[in-house]
């Protein structure tokens, strides 16, 4: 008989909700465990089967930790600002707030149907003014400390969408959404000075229990490099420009310089003969994003300005070019090119027939750039020195002659924080007619997003908020001075930078969260989510956390102690699930056909949590069959408990496999090896089917071990075993090391290396006892009859080999 999952799952979900089973208390006597999921963006499409994979993993840990006596914080919320809702509003004329609310209600229903043990009283929503009041408060603090500032920056402007796009949203000069042309244009934007935290963001990675690959991605993104700034004079002008280089030792090999096309000097130094070519080039590259411009595989392009720089080391004239692979936003927007020892410079020099001068011995520079180490040559006072010595000496020379200085540079840029969007947190700043700006006073927060019937791009580069005159225009009540509110909104990253803090104290209207509660719950013990957030979200959240630490709001330097990325669930054909491919699996359908417990079990059993694995209906059916077997072992056809389940039996049936199961499942859950833990649960059930009687204590222990993965069926079986309370807070099973030892082992007996018999012997039998048992075995006696035994080799617990001829 199979169990009725629809009935059982609804029954227990109702029970948990009515009894607030998973409400987190501030119980001081217990150890704490904070299990966090990356909260979802509530899209119109609803939950897909990829979401529950990470959610089930944290839920298993949360449920186990409760049973181990921990006070567990396991919350859920919504990252609900963002582009898709705004795009929907633009397309349909509907309010993004209503659309978002509808989607959240659907997501919440779906998540509840999967039986996760969230404390729903702590739900947060980034679009709730009571939440974003504190997002705005953090912004004001950043502004107070000089970490939020306005700057004119070249941005990816998309005229059709009427907005600025992030680099990641531009592909081949077109918007990722809709494929509209994108151009680069300078605009005033809000920036956050994340670079002020670059060193700490780098160094503190060492203390975190994170996958090495994610740490490495963050290190590369921050991109710390040591070198020197070198100042170049422009020949015939009183202008200079600075380049940052990690190889100041190769300065004698510099044969040309390259400026970013946006560099302010370009206009001043371009000669009349080159003006037309330079302007044509600037027009040509207008639609390329930074990512495309720096693509190593792309053909190099560039144009000569007609001007020359003076090499400070030897007075030689270097032609100044512009090329799109040099970015104004990286380093100083200018490079010195040493083509003999840099692949990119070499390629450029070959293409445009520029000189190549070797200054480090080694390689064949007629064929390719030599990037290895060697003695310096053609380098005056550096000749004969190696890289390290030459670098040190050149920096000393530059500093002594006022031509440069030692410098640390970062790949990390300040964070472009404004979006020309309606559906985001308003930035609480007022711009006055006299050119000054002031923050909105703290007591006036939240600055609420105004309701509007018409969300359309302003077309001026401002957000749709610029169209709402009665909201934008303000008058200073004290002076009568007129002003306009900031019309840009914050990016979707803002709300997700600190949501894990709000869960700790979600209803506090006096402060972001109570310091005592933060002290108690931080840092997050396990954070599980997709690897696509490896760099930006995690870096931004760490930056805000460190800032909040500096101003005394949070007690820890880092937010997330342990991080884990689950893999992706692919379609049955091994392709990424997508609506266009028609291979999306909807969890609602699975909950209906197989049940939430089956879905949870299957997703944890598919393979290692970090692996990307194809969905398989056969695998799903297999998971359901296992749960049916479990049910049949406990429950008779008539719904009564199996009479084989007895209290205090006079036997040690199942003793060893039970203790092995408790040990393995506990260790595997802790280490997130859910697939091998489930295999062990299956081993136990197989053994139990062979047993003549089933000791009740072991069967209860099994149900407890199963409960974090399949909570509904576990609650039902717990009730069948005679308990009236939820299983959620029952004590986690313990194992006895002594019971894990096998009393008997099977050994093989070989004659001349061939297996002739197998014997069950006591696990602690000595060599002498094994020899004796082997020689007394009837089959072996037959084999060696009439032969002389030359040697007997006994390996306790394994084998006996008899050499006879």
Swiss-Prot record:
It comes from Anoxybacillus flavithermus (strain DSM 21510 / WK1). Its EC number is 6.1.1.4. A motif ('HIGH' region) lies at residues 40-51. A motif ('KMSKS' region) lies at residues 576-580. Belongs to the class-I aminoacyl-tRNA synthetase family. GO terms for molecular function: aminoacyl-tRNA deacylase activity; ATP binding; leucine-tRNA ligase activity. The keyword ATP-binding applies. The keyword Aminoacyl-tRNA synthetase applies. One of its GO terms (cellular component) is cytosol. This is Leucine--tRNA ligase.
């Amino acid at each position: 008989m199979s169990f009725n999952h629809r009935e059982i799952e609804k029954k227990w979900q109702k029970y948990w909700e009515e009894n607030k089973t998973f409400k987190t208390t501030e119980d001081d006597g217990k150890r704490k465990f904070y299990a966090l999921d990356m909260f979802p963006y509530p899209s119109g499409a609803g939950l897909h089967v990829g979401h529950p994979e990470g959610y089930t993993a944290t839920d298993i840990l949360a449920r186990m930790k409760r049973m181990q006596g921990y006070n567990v914080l396991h919350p859920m919320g919504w990252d609900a600002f963002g582009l898709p809702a705004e795009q929907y509003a633009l397309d349909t004329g509907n309010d993004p707030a209503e659309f978002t609310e509808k989607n959240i209600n659907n997501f919440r229903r779906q998540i509840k149907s999967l039986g996760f043990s969230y404390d729903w009283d702590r739900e947060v929503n980034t679009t709730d003014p009571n939440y974003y009041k504190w997002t705005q408060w953090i912004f004001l603090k950043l502004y107070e400390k000089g970490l939020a500032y306005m700057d004119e920056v070249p941005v990816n402007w998309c005229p059709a969408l009427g907005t600025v796009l992030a680099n990641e949203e531009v592909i081949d000069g077109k918007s990722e959404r809709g494929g509209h042309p994108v151009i680069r244009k300078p605009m005033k934007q809000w920036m956050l000075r994340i670079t002020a935290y670059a060193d700490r963001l780098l160094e503190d990675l060492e203390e975190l229990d994170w996958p090495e690959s994610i740490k490495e991605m963050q290190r590369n993104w921050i991109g710390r490099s040591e070198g020197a700034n070198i100042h170049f004079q422009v020949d015939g002008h009183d202008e200079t420009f600075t380049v940052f280089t990690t190889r100041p030792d190769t300065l004698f090999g510099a044969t040309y310089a390259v400026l970013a096309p946006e560099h302010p000097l370009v206009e001043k130094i371009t000669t009349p003969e080159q003006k037309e070519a330079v302007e044509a080039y600037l027009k040509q590259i207008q639609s390329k994003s930074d990512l495309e411009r720096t693509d190593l595989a792309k053909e190099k392009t560039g144009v000569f300005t007609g001007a020359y720089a003076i090499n400070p080391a030897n007075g030689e004239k270097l032609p100044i070019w512009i090329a799109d692979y040099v970015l104004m936003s990286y380093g100083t927007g200018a490079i010195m090119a040493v083509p003999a020892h840099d692949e990119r410079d070499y390629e450029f020099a070959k293409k445009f027939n520029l000189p190549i001068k070797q200054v480090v011995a080694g390689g064949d520079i007629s064929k390719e750039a030599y990037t290895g180490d060697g003695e310096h040559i053609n380098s005056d006072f550096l000749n004969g020195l190696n890289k390290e010595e030459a670098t040190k000496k050149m920096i000393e020379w530059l500093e002594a002659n006022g031509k440069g200085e030692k410098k640390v540079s970062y790949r990390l840029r300040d964070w472009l924080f404004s979006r020309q969007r309606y559906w985001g947190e308003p930035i609480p700043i007022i711009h006055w007619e006299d050119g000054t700006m002031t923050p909105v006073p703290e007591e006036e927060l939240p600055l609420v997003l105004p309701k509007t019937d018409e969300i359309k791009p302003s077309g001026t580069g401002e957000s749709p908020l610029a169209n709402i005159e009665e909201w934008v225009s303000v008058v200073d009540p004290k002076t009568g001075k007129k002003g306009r509110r900031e019309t840009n909104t914050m990016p979707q990253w803002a709300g997700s930078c600190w949501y894990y803090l709000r869960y700790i104290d979600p209803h506090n209207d006096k402060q972001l969260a109570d310091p005592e509660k933060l002290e108690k719950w931080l840092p997050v013990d396990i954070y599980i989510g997709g690897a696509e957030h490896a760099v930006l979200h995690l870096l931004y959240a760490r930056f805000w956390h460190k800032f909040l630490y500096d101003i005394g709001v949070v007690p820890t330097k880092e937010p997330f102690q342990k991080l884990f990325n689950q893999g992706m669930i692919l379609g049955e054909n091994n392709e990424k699930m997508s609506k266009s491919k028609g291979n999306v699996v909807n969890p609602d359908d699975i909950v209906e056909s197989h049940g939430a417990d089956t879905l949870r079990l299957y997703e944890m059993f598919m393979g290692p949590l970090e692996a990307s694995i194809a969905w398989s209906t056969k695998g799903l059916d297999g998971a359901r069959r296992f749960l049916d077997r479990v049910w049949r072992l406990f429950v008779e056809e008539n719904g009564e408990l199996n009479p084989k389940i007895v209290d205090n039996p006079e036997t040690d049936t199942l003793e060893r496999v039970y203790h092995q199961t408790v040990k393995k499942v506990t260790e595997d859950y802790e280490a997130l090896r859910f697939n091998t833990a489930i295999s062990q649960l299956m081993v136990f059930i197989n053994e139990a089917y062979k047993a003549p009687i089933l000791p009740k204590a072991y069967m209860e222990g099994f149900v407890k071990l199963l409960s974090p993965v399949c909570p509904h069926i576990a609650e039902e079986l717990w009730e069948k075993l005679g308990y009236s309370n939820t299983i959620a807070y029952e004590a986690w099973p313990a194992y006895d090391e002594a019971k894990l030892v096998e009393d008997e082992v099977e050994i093989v007996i070989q004659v001349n290396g061939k297996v002739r018999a197998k014997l069950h012997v006591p696990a602690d039998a000595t060599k002498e006892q094994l020899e004796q048992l082997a020689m007394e075995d009837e089959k072996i006696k037959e084999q060696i009859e009439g032969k002389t035994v030359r040697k007997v080799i006994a390996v306790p617990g394994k084998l006996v080999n008899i050499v006879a001829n």
